[in-house]
UniProtKB/Swiss-Prot annotation:
This is Signal transduction protein TRAP. Each of the three conserved histidine residues contributes to TRAP phosphorylation. Phosphorylation is essential for TRAP activity. Phosphorylation of TRAP is activated by RAP and necessary for the induction of RNAIII gene expression but not for ongoing transcription. TRAP is dephosphorylated from the mid-exponential phase of growth, which is when agr is activated and AIP is produced. RIP acts by inhibiting TRAP phosphorylation. Signal transduction protein, which is a major regulator of staphylococcal pathogenesis. Phosphorylated TRAP leads to the activation of agr system and consequent RNAIII synthesis resulting in the expression of several virulence factors. Up-regulates the expression of most toxins and genes known to be necessary for biofilm formation. Residues 67-158 form the ABM domain. PANTHER family: SIGNAL TRANSDUCTION PROTEIN TRAP. GO terms for cellular component: membrane. The modification Phosphohistidine is found at residues 66, 79, 154. Keywords: Membrane, Phosphoprotein, Virulence. The gene is traP. SUPFAM superfamilies: Dimeric alpha+beta barrel. It is found in: Membrane. The keyword Signal does not apply. It comes from Staphylococcus aureus (strain bovine RF122 / ET3-1). The lineage of its organism: Bacteria, Bacillati, Bacillota, Bacilli, Bacillales.
Length: 167
C-alpha cells in the first residue's frame, strides 16, 4: 500500500535531505512557521521519524508548484470507521473546481487523526473551493464534527497551509 511520510523542520535541514536523496520523490513546502517535506511511496522512506499515513484515496499528482491545504481531522476509535466510510464515499466532483490539482485522503498508521490534502493552483482557488457547498457539506469542521467523539476533540480539527517555495 502506498504511504505518505511527512516531517517538519527548518528549510535548510529539510532541503539538505532533498538534495542528498535525488532518487526519492521528495516534496518540500513552506508553512506559516516552518517547512514540511513529504514522500509518497510504496518503498521505504528516507525520512527519519516521520508521521506515517496510508493513502486510501487519491486524485492527481503532487507538485511543488501548487498550493496545498492539509486538513487534520480528529476522531476516536468509536468513530473512525464511520468517518473513513463517509470520506471515501464523497463524490469527487470537487475536482471540477477551477484550479483544482490533487487530493489525498490519508489514514493514520498510529492514532486516529485522519488527514486530507487538497492541492490547488494557488491559495485563492482553494479559498473559492472552501466557500463552496461541496466543501461545507463534506470537509468543513461542522460537517465532520459528529465523527470527532468527545467535545474536547473539536479544537483539534485544523488546516495547515503549504506554500510553494520560491527560490
Amino acid at each position: 500500500m502506498k504511504k505518505l511520510y511527512t516531517s517538519y523542520g527548518t528549510y535548510g535541514f529539510l532541503n539538505q535531505i532533498k538534495i542528498n536523496n535525488p532518487s526519492h520523490h521528495l516534496f518540500q513546502f513552506s508553512t506559516a512557521d516552518s517547512s514540511v517535506i513529504f514522500e509518497e511511496t510504496e518503498e521505504n522512506t528516507v525520512l527519519k521519524s516521520p508521521s506515517i499515513y496510508e493513502v486510501i484515496k487519491e486524485i492527481g499528482a503532487f507538485n511543488e508548484d501548487h498550493f496545498y491545504c492539509a486538513i487534520f481531522i480528529p476522531s476516536t476509535e468509536d468513530h473512525v470507521y464511520q468517518l473513513e466510510k463517509k470520506l471515501i464515499s464523497v463524490d469527487d466532483n470537487f475536482k471540477n473546481f477551477g484550479g483544482f490539482k490533487s487530493y489525498r485522503l490519508l489514514r493514520p498508521v498510529k492514532g486516529t487523526t485522519y488527514k486530507i490534502y487538497f492541492g490547488f493552483a494557488d491559495r485563492q482557488t482553494y479559498e473559492d473551493f472552501k466557500n463552496s457547498d461541496a466543501f461545507k457539506d463534506h470537509f468543513s469542521k461542522e460537517a465532520l464534527s459528529h465523527y470527532f467523539g468527545s467535545s474536547g476533540q473539536h479544537s483539534s480539527y485544523f488546516e495547515r497551509y503549504l506554500y510553494p517555495i520560491k527560490e
